[in-house]
Regions:
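Conserved, well-structured beta-alpha core segment at the onset of a catalytic domain
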Residues: 69-121
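Gly/Ser/Thr/Pro-enriched helix-cap/hinge segments flanking short amphipathic alpha-helices
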Residues: 66, 106-119, 127-128, 135-138, ...
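Acidic/hydrophobic-patterned starts of short beta strands in beta-sheet-rich repeat architectures
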Residues: 42-51, 93-102, 231-240, 295-304
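Solenoidal tandem-repeat scaffolds enriched in leucines and small polar residues
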Residues: 1-37
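Conserved hydrophobic/aromatic "anchor" residues
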Residues: 4, 15-16, 40, 60, ...
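Surface-exposed loop and turn segments in beta-propeller and other repeat-based domains
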Residues: 20-26, 73-77, 136-161, 197, ...
């Protein structure tokens, strides 16, 4: 992974790779699947969150221009997953940013918990002189192979000589098959959390994990987006699902139709039925972006399908209350990195402006308002702040960076 510094000048675009000391550990962070720039601890400096396959969601805290890995300190290190995606929002209305993360779900042949993770080894296990991948799992507190004798022997023929029958192979533990010495010299990766969920922020950059409802665990989640869809001022969550092409011995992760979850304003969610929402995506959903496609002030969705046509869903039910657009200048016209507090008689909710997130996606950098919003308070990327009244009769409210 690389951190690129923008050193563009007038009429010339130029990015330069940052020296390693600007982001220690980022180059070798692991198998990255997604990233989000967000102020996780509310100190005014934009931090970096990175999702991994076979690893945690890592937090690199921005300490005055240097990204420092504080994953362990934040509590994120406890949850190793096959994380696919990440987006930020304030579903519990407490003024800090929480993070929704997509994972493989609970409707697969894989099962894991903190004491019994699924495991992946990478090393040399025989006389072929080639490094191999070995999947492993727990059975009755013993580590055993996740793959059978036939495919294992095809990859490593020496196992056919060591285990003459299927019964012998099936009765052996992983160290008996590959030796403890070879396993100890291998790269070892684990996943102990397979649920998709929300990392709830304590306001200081510390996190606790809250799984999404069981209906959201029916399939792997990729694109996901916090959005207020029903006009009650509480953030909801929409996610697209499915993965049809695991290795041939594994059934497809294809039990989802996408999932729309209604937020309760306290960080909890309940399922909205597909018949009510009209959001049905039975194929392999990947990218998800939110935008006002028809200019009616309501949030709509664009869904990218793996090997399929782009889908568009227009919102017909949310009460239209207009949108907020921040107007920047220079190299940041959409004011990415701004933090906006929506103020209503029922309380406040924090929202950030992103330039990308979810699963390889970028939503329109506008904020859909609900009818109760009377004022917005903006913390601009440079650190200045301003407060602005909102007219509910205005279709689009535009606020420019103060001079």
């Amino acid at each position: 992974s690389r951190l690129l510094l923008n050193e563009s000048g007038e009429g010339k675009v130029r990015f330069v790779e940052a020296p390693p000391e600007r982001a220690p550990g980022l180059r070798s962070t692991g198998m990255v699947t997604g990233a989000l720039w967000s102020d996780a601890d509310g100190d005014g400096w934009i931090d970096l969150l990175v999702t991994h396959e076979w690893g945690p969601v890592k937090l690199f805290r921005n300490e005055k221009g240097t990204l420092v890995d504080v994953t362990e300190k934040s509590g994120l290190d406890k949850h190793l997953g096959w994380w696919n995606s990440i987006t930020g929002g304030d579903p519990d209305n407490d003024g800090d940013i929480d993070y929704a993360v997509g994972n493989v779900g609970l409707n697969t042949k894989y099962h894991a918990d903190p004491g019994h993770p699924v495991i992946l080894y990478y090393g040399d296990y025989g006389d072929e002189g080639v490094k191999r991948l070995v999947e492993a799992k727990y059975e009755n507190d013993e580590i055993v192979p996740a793959r059978g004798k036939s495919c294992s022997t095809k990859a490593m023929p020496h196992l056919g000589k060591k285990f003459g029958t299927f019964h012998q192979f099936a009765s052996a533990t992983l160290p008996q098959i590959y030796t403890s010495e070879c396993l100890s010299e291998s790269v070892k990766l684990e996943a102990n959390t397979l649920e998709s969920g929300i990392f709830i922020n304590d306001g200081k950059g510390g996190f606790s994990f809250r799984p999404l409802p069981s209906t959201a665990q029916s399939s792997a989640i990729f694109g996901l987006e916090f959005v207020e869809v029903d006009g009650d001022g509480k953030l909801d969550l929409y996610a697209v699902q499915n993965f049809s092409n695991p290795q041939f011995e594994t059934p497809p992760f294809r039990g989802g139709l996408s999932v729309l979850l209604r937020g309760d304003g306290k960080g909890g969610f309940t399922m909205i039925s597909h018949s009510e929402s009209g959001l049905v995506v039975p194929t392999d959903g990947r990218a998800l972006a939110c935008s006002d496609l028809n200019g009616d002030g309501r949030p709509d969705f664009l869904v990218g399908i793996n090997n399929g046509e782009l889908l568009a869903f227009t919102n017909r039910r949310t009460p239209s209350a207009g949108v907020l657009r921040l107007q920047g200048e220079g190299g940041n016209p959409s004011v990415a990195g701004a933090r906006v507090t929506l103020v209503s008689k029922d309380g406040t909710r924090m929202q950030e402006v992103y330039q990308g997130g979810g699963y390889l996606s970028q939503s329109t950098p506008t904020i859909c308002l609900h009818s109760g919003v009377t004022r917005v308070e903006v913390v601009w990327p440079g650190g200045s702040s301003s407060s602005h009244p909102v007219d509910p009769a205005t279709r689009e409210t535009v606020i420019s960076v103060p001079e």
